Amino acid sequence: MSIDQVTLARELNHLRELAQKKWEEDPLPTGRDAEVRLKKEIQELALESHITDFETDGYTVLPPGTAAPIELFDEIASVMEGLAKRLKTDNPAVSGLGETLYHMLPEHPAFERALMARAPLTLVTYLLGYRAKLSQCTGLIKDSNVPALGIHADHSAKFPAPWSPISNYSVVSWVLTDYTRENGAVCVWPGSHLRGQPVPENLVMAHDHPEMRVLEIPRGSVIIWHGSLWHGALPRTASGRRMTLVLPHVRDSVQPQELFWSSVTEEMISRNPPRFCTLMGLTSGPPWFQDGPDREQFVMSPYGGSKFE
């Protein structure tokens, strides 16, 4: 049974029309204007040290109180616990990821508020440009049965190596419970993003390598990293659960892993700033059906040559 492409095209075009109206409220910059606007936003939010972190280490951590009030973290954790009881989850205990919830964005407005939080989104813009799209809205729940997650780079299995210094994929992790060694914290290899290469096979489980750094950080923190950064996670040995909201993003030219333009609603568009539509992929040129590309859509696409578009 095939999908009714006529109905799908009509519904998608309707959402794109709404997105275009929102766009007119606050058009995204191109070319040199994108760099100027981003620099101003970074200064307004005092994020300069985090930009330095990206360049040297390939990741940065926003401390509690920077991305959002702690109440939002607690609300997200509560919502995820409820979703885990009624929705299908994925990944056996041996995977290293833990219990995984996919495509959570349409399930609760709390995820929208996390997505639109200004400081993390500004850092995503630095890595992927103003037209970055949300690729996943995923919840990870690790209990004491979950082993270590192998060290890897998110560009692996997505882009051929050697990778460009420019990131095409970036992860934003909302730390909903304390990260400690015993709790199965994320670990990273600082500066590995500069190699532009996948993790060698002999280092995939080298969590105790002297170059690896364990991120022992409190609940309420947010981690953002470059797609080429080598990272993994320790096994959880403590009782209880480690919970994380994971929001990977991609550049405008890259296809997201989850089809948000197919599940976004008019209400979601209405209650969010204009850039929400871009994150949903509604201001990108593709995809299209037999009616072909909408030329007005391409007006909203990057065309000035800046990596910050």
Predicted regions, residues:
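Non-heme Fe(II)-dependent double-stranded beta-helix
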Residues: 2-161
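Conserved double-stranded beta-helix
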Residues: 20, 195-200, 204-224, 228-229, ...
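Short hydrophobic-aromatic micro-motifs
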Residues: 61-62, 172, 223-225
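Short connector loops at helix/strand junctions that flank enzyme active sites
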Residues: 134, 146-148, 167-169, 240-242
